[in-house]
C-alpha cells in the first residue's frame, strides 16, 4: 500500500503549489485566491523507490460555520482521517495566526504523525523568523519554498521517515487490470458531483447548490464489480466567452485535459434545461478527442411527459453526431436509473479497446464493396484492397487501395456501419482512414 500524505493548512498558504511539487504536475489549480481548493484532490508521487499518494485539501478552518467553508472543513477532516502522515503548512512570511493555533490544536488531538512546514521561507533567517511557530507545540519547523523547490525533498524524506516504510518490492509490469479512467463531464450544476457522491456513498466532492462549485478536476479511486475505476469530476465547463476569472479559465483547461486523458466520458445533461449550445460544444470536444462516451440525462424526474418528448427530439437532432452512444435517463439525487450506466460504461470501454484482426477487417471490406461499390469520380473509381487496425481508444481502421481520396463521406459512413455491427462498437467513435497506394511510375513520368 502506498503511504498517504495529507496537506493541511489555512487558505492561501501554498498547499496546492506544494502538491504540484510533490506530484511533479500541475494537477491542482494554483492562483493567488484564498479558498481555491475545496475538495480532496489526490495525486501520485515518487521519491527514489518509494511511491506515495498526496491529498491536497481546501483551506482548513476547524470551526467554520458558514456555507461552503463548513463543507471544506469537513473535506479536510476526512482527508486527515485517510492520511498516514499530515503535513501542516503555515505561511512563514505572514507569521503565526489564530487559525494556525486552531488547526494545531485539532491535529494534536488526533495523535497522527504530523510535520510542521513553514512555506514561502526563501531568503529568510529560519532561526529567527520561524521561531514563533514553535508555540504550536508540533516540534521543529521545516522551512521550504514550494514555489522554488527549496527544502521540499528534505521535507518529504522526513515525512516518509516517520512511517518507517519497508523497502518496496518490484512492481509487475502494466497489465490489462489498469483502472478505467472515467470522466464525468458537463456544464456547471448538472449534477456531476452529486452522481459521483451517490456512487461512492460519501460526500467526496463538494456538491453545493450553485453553478461552478467544483472548480478542479478531481480524481477518485473506485471499484465496481471487481473493476478498478478512477472517477473524474471535470469542473463543470462554461463557454469560454463567458469566463472572466482566471480560476474558471484554468478549470476549463483542466476539464479538456481530463476528457483527453479519460478512457470513457460520461456526458451529463440537465433535463430541466434541454440540450444547450454548450452541451453540444462539450459533446463535440469529446468526439474530437476520440473518447468513448455514454450520455446521461439527469433530473429526468423533474420534467413532465411533454418535456421528455421535446428533450428526446432535441438530443436526436443536436447530438446526432453521438448516435453511437448509449443514452440513459437518470436522477442522481433519487438514485434512479444508475445501475444500467455501468453496463454501458463497460461496453463503451470494451468497444474502444477492441482488437480487430486484419483478415476479418479485409473480409468485411470486400463484402461491403461487393454489396455496394464506391461511386466513380470522373475518370477515377476507388479500388479498395485490404484493411487493418491502426489504433485503439478510439479504434482506427486503415483501408488501403487506389484513388481512395475520391471516396465520399457517405460511403465512409456506410463502411462504418458494417464495421460497427460486426464488432459491436457501441459507445466509441470509429475513425476510418484511407491510404492510397503510391504509383511507382508517377514520379518517373514527371522527370
Curated annotation (Swiss-Prot):
Keywords: GTP-binding, Nucleotide-binding, Repeat, Ribosome biogenesis. PROSITE patterns: G_ENGA (PS51712). Residues 353-438 form the KH-like domain. It comes from the Bacteria. One of its GO terms (biological process) is ribosome biogenesis. SUPFAM superfamilies: P-loop containing nucleoside triphosphate hydrolases (SSF52540). InterPro entries: G_ENGA, GTP-bd, GTPase_Der, KH_dom-like, KH_dom-like_a/b, P-loop_NTPase, Small_GTP-bd. CDD domains: EngA1, EngA2. It holds the Pfam family KH_dom-like. GTP 1 binds at residues 9-16, 56-60, 119-122. Residues 3-167, 180-353 form the EngA-type G domain. GO terms for molecular function: GTP binding; ribosome binding. GTP 2 binds at residues 186-193, 233-237, 298-301. The keyword Nucleotide-binding applies. Belongs to the TRAFAC class TrmE-Era-EngA-EngB-Septin-like GTPase superfamily. EngA (Der) GTPase family. NCBIfam families: GTPase_EngA, small_GTP. Associates with the 50S ribosomal subunit. GTPase that plays an essential role in the late steps of ribosome biogenesis. This is GTPase Der. It comes from Paracidovorax citrulli (strain AAC00-1) (Acidovorax citrulli). The gene is der.
Amino acid at each position: 500500500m502506498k503511504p498517504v500524505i495529507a496537506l493541511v493548512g489555512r487558505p492561501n498558504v501554498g498547499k496546492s503549489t506544494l502538491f504540484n511539487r510533490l506530484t511533479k504536475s500541475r494537477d491542482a489549480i494554483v492562483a493567488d485566491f484564498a479558498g481555491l481548493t475545496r475538495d480532496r484532490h489526490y495525486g501520485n508521487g515518487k521519491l527514489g523507490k518509494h511511491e506515495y499518494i498526496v491529498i491536497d485539501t481546501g483551506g482548513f478552518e476547524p470551526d467554520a460555520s458558514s456555507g461552503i467553508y463548513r463543507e471544506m472543513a469537513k473535506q479536510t477532516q476526512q482527508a486527515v482521517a485517510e492520511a498516514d502522515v499530515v503535513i501542516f503548512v503555515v505561511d512563514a512570511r505572514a507569521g503565526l495566526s489564530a487559525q494556525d493555533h486552531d488547526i494545531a490544536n485539532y491535529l494534536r488531538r488526533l495523535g497522527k504523525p504530523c510535520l510542521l512546514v513553514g512555506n514561502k521561507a526563501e531568503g529568510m533567517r529560519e532561526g529567527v523568523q520561524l521561531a514563533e511557530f514553535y508555540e504550536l507545540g508540533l516540534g521543529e519547523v521545516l522551512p521550504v519554498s514550494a514555489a522554488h523547490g527549496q527544502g521540499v525533498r528534505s521535507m518529504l524524506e522526513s515525512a516518509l521517515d516517520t512511517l518507517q516504510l519497508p523497502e518496496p518490492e518490484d512492481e509487475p509490469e502494466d497489465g490489462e487490470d489498469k483502472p478505467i479512467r472515467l470522466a464525468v463531464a458537463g456544464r456547471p450544476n448538472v449534477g456531476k458531483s452529486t452522481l459521483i457522491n451517490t456512487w461512492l456513498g460519501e460526500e467526496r466532492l463538494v456538491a453545493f447548490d450553485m453553478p461552478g462549485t467544483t472548480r478542479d478536476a478531481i480524481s477518485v479511486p473506485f471499484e465496481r464489480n471487481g473493476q478498478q475505476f478512477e472517477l473524474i469530476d471535470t469542473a463543470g465547463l462554461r463557454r469560454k466567452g463567458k469566463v472572466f476569472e482566471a480560476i474558471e479559465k484554468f478549470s476549463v483547461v483542466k476539464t479538456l485535459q481530463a476528457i483527453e486523458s479519460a478512457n470513457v466520458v460520461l456526458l451529463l445533461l440537465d433535463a430541466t434545461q434541454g440540450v444547450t449550445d454548450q452541451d453540444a460544444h462539450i459533446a463535440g470536444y469529446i468526439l474530437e478527442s476520440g473518447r468513448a462516451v455514454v450520455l446521461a440525462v439527469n433530473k429526468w424526474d423533474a420534467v413532465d411527459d411533454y418535456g421528455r418528448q421535446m428533450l428526446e427530439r432535441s438530443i436526436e437532432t443536436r447530438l446526432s453526431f453521438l448516435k453511437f452512444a448509449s443514452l440513459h435517463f437518470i436522477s442522481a439525487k433519487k438514485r434512479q436509473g444508475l445501475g444500467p450506466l455501468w453496463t454501458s460504461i463497460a461496453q463503451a470501454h470494451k468497444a474502444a479497446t477492441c482488437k480487430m484482426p486484419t483478415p476479418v477487417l479485409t473480409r468485411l471490406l470486400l463484402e461491403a464493396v461487393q454489396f455496394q461499390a464506391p461511386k466513380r469520380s470522373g475518370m477515377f473509381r476507388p479500388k479498395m484492397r485490404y484493411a487493418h487496425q491502426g489504433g485503439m481508444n478510439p479504434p482506427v481502421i486503415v483501408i488501403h487501395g487506389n484513388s481512395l481520396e475520391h471516396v465520399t463521406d457517405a460511403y465512409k459512413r456506410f463502411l462504418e456501419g458494417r464495421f460497427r455491427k460486426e464488432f459491436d462498437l457501441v459507445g466509441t467513435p470509429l475513425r476510418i482512414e484511407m491510404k492510397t497506394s503510391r504509383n511507382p511510375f508517377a514520379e518517373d513520368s514527371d522527370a
